[in-house]
Amino acid sequence: MSARGTFDVALEGAVFACVQVHPGHEQAFDDWYGLDHFYSGGVLGPAVLSGKRWFADRRLRESRFVSDDCLHPDPRAGNHLAAYWLTTGGLHGFFSWVRPQLALLRAEGRMFEARSHVIVDGYRAAWPLAHTASSSVDPVAALDHGFGGLFVSYGEPTGAPPVPAEALPPHSLGIVFAPAAGSLDNNSVQTPPGAPGLAFPTASGAAVMTMLFLPARPSSDLAWSRRIAVELSRASGTAPLWGAGFYPIEAGSSSHVARMS
């Protein structure tokens, strides 16, 4: 942000919040997140360009790619996902703001306990993923474009150079992210010290996330998930660990709620 208080229109990073809503609390969660926390804990923060929500029903969660090397303790958890794009300076500005903001919301009784954190972290945008017939949508506009679905993958860096992908869905858009260290800690989200649910765990301590915005809904087929995850790992120079599809949530609609259980 400049001295005049204006913002660049650029993608510096992202806030990624994947949680598992506890059974029987889906509607209450949706009311809370969709009409309060999405804004008070996200969109209204400094340097936020945009935000978007997705969900995963049971079939999608069961069709996730999970490698033998995946260290996540519950890789099929996560039925709700929110992401926020951050402009230049946003990684520092947003997380400096959100830590006390969460404490304030908690003091006002505006948090929701019937959910478990699965992956909640901040990421720095690394590069747009190159692949055949990629979407022409600028990554800055990805959350607002109206893509039909999302596939998220995690991989562990191997040192191998990225290879342009050749077998991803036409007109999809891939963006590679690296973790932004120190974004959140257990104290920020009120979980016990060392409890899982923040950064994606890997043997080396490093994880690369790729978000692939899809022109259509993701398949609930395990072979499809495996193929996409492996292709994304090659294109990001990583060993594939985890890959998951998500359906978009329409703002103001609750049609997805019954499918979250």
Which residues does each predicted region cover?
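Macromolecular interaction modules
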Residues: 1-261
